[in-house]
Amino acid sequence: MGLETLFAPERVAVVGATERDGSVGRAVMENLLSEFAGETVPVNPNTDAVLGLETVPDLTRTGDVDLAVVVVPPSVAIDVVRQAGEEGIENVVVITAGFGETGSEGAARERELREVAERYDLNLVGPNSLGVIATGVGMNATFGPDMALDGDISFMSQSGAFITAVLDWANDRGIGFRDVVSLGNKAVLDERDFVRAWGDDPDTDVVLGYLEGIGEGRAFIDAAREVTQDTPIVLVKSGRTEAGAHAAASHTGTIAGSEAAYEAGLDQAGVLRAENVQELFDSAEALAGQPLPESDDVAVVTNAGGPGVMATDAVGDAGLSLASFSQATLDQLGEELPETANIYNPVDVIGDADVDRFAAAIDTALSDPTVGAACIVSCPVAVLTFEELAAVIVEKQAEHGKPVAVCFMGGDSAREAQETLNAAGIPAYFDPARAIRSLDALREFRDSSTREYDPAAEYDDVDPDAVREILQEAAGRGETRIGVEAMDLLSAYGIPVPDGAVVDSPDDAREVAESIDGDVVMKVVSPDILHKSDIGASASASRTTRWPRRTTTWSSAHGPTSLTPTSSACRSRSCWTSTPASRLSSASTATRSSVPSYCSVSGASSSKCWRTPPFASRRSRSERRAR
């Protein structure tokens, strides 16, 4: 089922609507009645009217509605969702909290909610959600204080409070949104569903998100990878630290997961990652309004030397390049600018430049074929107003079709000019580094959207019974990590592993090594020795190594160790050996310095032999049980 009617409903029912001051039910009703183009139906069995609208007792009396917003207590919410499903309502937003974020009882309640929603194939947002905003139909189905301005950014967040803060800030900046979704606990709909929906929406130019965790990593990567071919996705992913992950778990019940895995997965999906809120929206403004650069070479044009140097440093910090102008460009700038100006990049038109001199320099810099983007930096001067310069920048950017970011280093004097630039889709900032980072976001999206990715490897020959058996045996021994059985585990997942075997005598080691096609490596099998090379407990040799016939031992802090001269290994073939402690009595004693150059090492702490050949080919289930 698509999400079209979630974002463009004609009739919305509010279950739990009320006139009680300070209540969520009243806030949702007031927000819907303020701008919503459709019809709002209050549902409350205990009153006849809410805010001048006649109420109905339950969803069986609402007639056809496209969306039900649920603001009743959690003990009642599941029955309301069930009734919505029975009445054929496609979309439900559960604002009610008290589910998976509250502990085991709430988690059980959330599982039941999910089961009900899935039974009726409902598009369910939440629970524990602020609600949903769709500016295309003027719908504010939230209990937040602000309606979003109309725009082309779609935004999802696991934090409802963050949405209220963002809307307050964005309204002041004049930044608009297409859709805004408070994901809540993501019992049914999650980031994958909204990424897909907004990827298909021609009115969404950029997708932004604040996430504490991603439930189905592979599915999200697949969905995002398809969308980011055309539509940029920028995320702030929190819970990066141990303390942050713990806080995320208490906030929405989210398991934050491995930071390294998120970094790799988001990169594979073509998702841009912002470190903070400012960077999130700086990137969004550039991506929503500017073309992509054809090269990484940036031209900086400024009327102030110091800020120009700041911008130049930021170019290098971002991994971009300062454009090297052609001789024709340098000649042209030399004619347009006074001798005291700097015609090389960064171009300094100096502080007495009027709008005509600035315009000529911008035009010439953007005309250079090596320039992929430009950053215009200006400080307040008496001979030039920011409004005059903003009009020139809008004109030249449209003429050349190259991305431009602007740094107007002023306060109130720059506000009107910034509004002019923002209306034209040109980002404007006070800090030169922010302007350059916005250009870097364009470069990053250009590269990620055109990058070819290998499809994820799929292993059809997976034996879950073998994996379960290996792990259960290790758990039965009280072990928290596995040793050589790791190769069996990888093999059970269909992952190729080197050939080899576990042996318990020099003769067996020699026999296995000689049967391996290629060089051989031998290592100790002992749960007490993690870094075997530190104590000489591993060795390698080529196939041409002569096989000695004697056995020696030596003592160290790890106890007596059996040394068996043998061939050893290599890059892709291995032979492991383990000798029980009882066999060491027949060995002679030697110092570590007398250990032969090529030997296998077996820790005396191995009181039994590992019989599982860890590098062997896949065995059948019956063969494993027969061993």
Regions found by a protein language model. Give the residues of each.
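Catalytic-core regions of core metabolic enzymes
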Residues: 1-627
